[in-house]
Amino acid sequence: MNIEYPYSIHIIDKNKVPIYDQGNLFHTEKSSRLSHVSRGLLDHLFTFSSDNTERVRKLHILADYLYLLESERESYKNEWISLKDQVSLLQKQNSELRARIATNKEIIEGLREPVKKPIYTTQDKERLRVFFCEERSMEYIYYHIKRLAQQSYYSHLNNLQKDCEPFRGVYMSFLTNVKFLVLCEAGYWTVPDIETNTTESILSLSQKKGEDLLQKGVVIFNELEGGYQLSPRFIGDLYAHGFIKQINFTTKVPEGLPPIIAEKLQDYKFPGSNTVLIEREIPRWNFNEMKRETQMRTNLYIFKNYRCFYGYSPLRPYEPITPEEFGFDYYSWENMVDEDEGEVVYISKYTKIIKVTKEHAWAWPEHDGDTMSCTTSIEDEWIHRMDNA
């Protein structure tokens, strides 16, 4: 061994091999690119011994070393192929997600477009009138109550029929206020004698139509009076969605209201006939941002005797709500409490019940022209407002 070149011991597999720490005895053009251990093994092949048996042993060591290197290289190659496949899959998923994001962005931007006031021709107005005349039935109102309760506003809009597209702006307004389709304009109410102040609560339906609505749970059959009336379940839906504006009763609150509301009205009613005015803190629509500016509380006012709050609307056990949410001004009775004309008998987070202690000759101001009578033709009212827009 050359003392000028100190060495260190390296373990390759089960063999201990001395490798020079400095310098190399064997040099080629490509050997300089090898590692220090590889170059040392080449040197070791021709040093320390000239015996052929020893050289064969050294060749075995070199072969083992090359096998370990190639095995490690093959392992890295397989791992690289696996990683390459994963990268390709991630790139594909990334492209799909980018395309989906772009599509969703277009949808969102489309929904954010401000509602433009459409320009209607005479033909458009006639189509709109026919649309409201043919579709404004109790089933249609019930259908929209359920649809709007089960899915978002925009999901409902995106499912519009193609023939409704020309009236998309009008239909959006309609969906924001299904109350605009007044129940007694559905053609199912009998016309009471207003002069004699009678009340007619039985729906005038054909047998086929009555059985159909009965099966859907919209009405029930009143055997005593021989006619149909709204079912408690449907009345509950109407109350929850703001359709019911006025309730008239004498001894017992009609079925269908929330139990706590019915119980409190029964506890604080006047002897004899009563009128309950249901005044919601009206939600307004911001059509630029397409969202509700909503207050949740509902105020209920108990009046003594039967009252008529909406112009010359006939008296019925249930009055449909007027379209305040659509943008009309409305008269509020809440100031009666401040003027000591009413007493708060029940209050919760979402409901307040006031018993009106002062007699009022008229329940609604005669000069209020923005209140739509329940006997007004809904399609004529709509066309009138478009003509005067």
From Swiss-Prot:
One Pfam family cited in the UniProt record for this chain: RTBV_P46
InterPro entries listed in its UniProt record: RTBV_P46
Superkingdom assignment: Viruses
Name under which the protein is recorded: Protein P4
Lineage: Viruses, Riboviria, Pararnavirae, Artverviricota, Revtraviricetes
